[in-house]
Amino acid sequence: MAKRSGSNTTTPTDEAVASERAHEVASRLRLAVARLHRTLRQHADSGLSPSQLSALVAIERHGSMTLGELAAHESVAPPTITGVVARLEADGNVAREPDAVDRRVVRVTATPQGRAVVVRTRERKDAWLTQRVAELGADDLERLADALQVIEALGERVDR
């Protein structure tokens, strides 16, 4: 809360201004992150649709997953994830395997080819972003590094 100069009290106006500023900054941050995400996705050049790449990255990161687990992780309906996995499987990026404990359950795992797609995609995104960051002046680079500390802290608060 903002305090009046020389006072231990805040005014409704101070709180409203602070709240409005927080909303403005949050909106700009959300838009900037979305724009950067979209641009990185365009430079990934993975040959996969965004939903296929997202599912493949989730499988590669979390290991073997059931279709239900993957659908929940991706926040999509099971029939949607079934189609995504079918395409990934047809392209050789994932394999379906019976669960070791319950043979009725099918698990999806990334193939070596699928893992290579994820690695290659990350490398392309990192290379593009590294080039953009390297073009910044020294002052902007330091401001970005400082801002990242705040952004990372925001992310940690959300994860709690």
Please name every model-derived segment.
Residues 1-50:
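N-terminal leader segment of winged-helix/HTH proteins
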Residues 2-3, 86-146:
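Charged, amphipathic alpha-helical coiled-coil/dimerization segments
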Residues 17-21, 132-135, 155-160:
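Amphipathic alpha-helical linker/stalk segments
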Residues 35, 60-61, 72-73, 120, ...:
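Alpha-helical structural segments
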Residues 39-80, 91-93, 107:
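N-terminal helix-turn-helix DNA-binding core of bacterial DNA-binding proteins
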Residues 83:
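DNA-binding alpha-helical recognition surfaces that contact promoter or target DNA
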Residues 142-160:
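Exposed, interaction-prone assembly regions rather than primary DNA-binding/catalytic cores
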